């Protein structure tokens, strides 16, 4: 049996560009892709913290060091510049892989600077 597991996440990224008349995708600073283990053309899910929108697209490489998060094409209608979003990549894993797996979690501040990375999400208390 295989399970679909979170592999990489960019948490609270700020949208820097929304380009409606561009081939669909999400342009992401290559440094962010590397940190989260996401590769160009990989399927990603995006969750908009500001309005609750959830949608899928694919990642494309953005200029390294630019701190860019650009929603392109139809995705540009799902968020505004300045919105906080979560970008996730998932992948199938066997039970043996699941037992060893730790996702690559990248946390960003309001200026899209990486403030920390982790491989664990803290236990949520009641």
Curated annotation (Swiss-Prot):
Pfam family, one: Asp_decarbox
Keyword Translocase: no
GO biological process: alanine biosynthetic process; pantothenate biosynthetic process
Positions contributing to substrate binding: 57, 73-75
UniProt modified residues of type Pyruvic acid (Ser): 25
EC number(s) on file: 4.1.1.11
Free-text description of this protein's post-translational modifications in UniProt: Is synthesized initially as an inactive proenzyme, which is activated by self-cleavage at a specific serine bond to produce a beta-subunit with a hydroxyl group at its C-terminus and an alpha-subunit with a pyruvoyl group at its N-terminus.
Matches recorded under InterPro entries: Asp_de-COase-like_dom_sf, Asp_decarbox
Cofactor binding note from Swiss-Prot or TrEMBL: Binds 1 pyruvoyl group covalently per subunit.
Keyword terms: Autocatalytic cleavage, Cytoplasm, Decarboxylase, Lyase, Pantothenate biosynthesis, Pyruvate, Schiff base, Zymogen
Primary residence: cytoplasm
Annotated Gene Ontology cellular component terms: cytosol
Complex and partners: Heterooctamer of four alpha and four beta subunits.
UniProt family annotation: Belongs to the PanD family.
Organism: Tolumonas auensis (strain DSM 9187 / NBRC 110442 / TA 4)
Active site per UniProt: 25, 58
Pathway stated in the Swiss-Prot or TrEMBL entry: Cofactor biosynthesis; (R)-pantothenate biosynthesis; beta-alanine from L-aspartate: step 1/1
Function: Catalyzes the pyruvoyl-dependent decarboxylation of aspartate to produce beta-alanine.
GO terms for MF: aspartate 1-decarboxylase activity
Subcellular locations according to the entry: Cytoplasm
Keyword Ribonucleoprotein appears in the UniProt entry: no
Reaction(s) catalysed (UniProt annotation): L-aspartate + H(+) = beta-alanine + CO2
Name this polypeptide is given: Aspartate 1-decarboxylase
């Amino acid at each position: 049996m295989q399970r679909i597991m979170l592999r990489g996440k960019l948490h609270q990224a700020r949208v820097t560009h929304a380009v409606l008349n561009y081939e669909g995708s999400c342009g992401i600073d290559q440094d962010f892709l590397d940190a989260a283990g996401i590769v160009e053309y990989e399927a990603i899910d995006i969750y908009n913290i500001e309005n609750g929108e959830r949608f899928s697209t694919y990642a494309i490489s953005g200029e390294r060091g630019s701190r860019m998060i650009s929603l392109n094409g139809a995705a540009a209608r799902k968020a505004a510049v300045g919105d906080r979003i979560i970008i996730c990549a998932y992948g199938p894993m066997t039970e043996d892989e699941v037992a060893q797996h730790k996702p690559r979690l990248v946390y960003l501040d309001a200026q899209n600077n990486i403030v920390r990375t982790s491989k664990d999400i803290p236990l949520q208390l009641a």
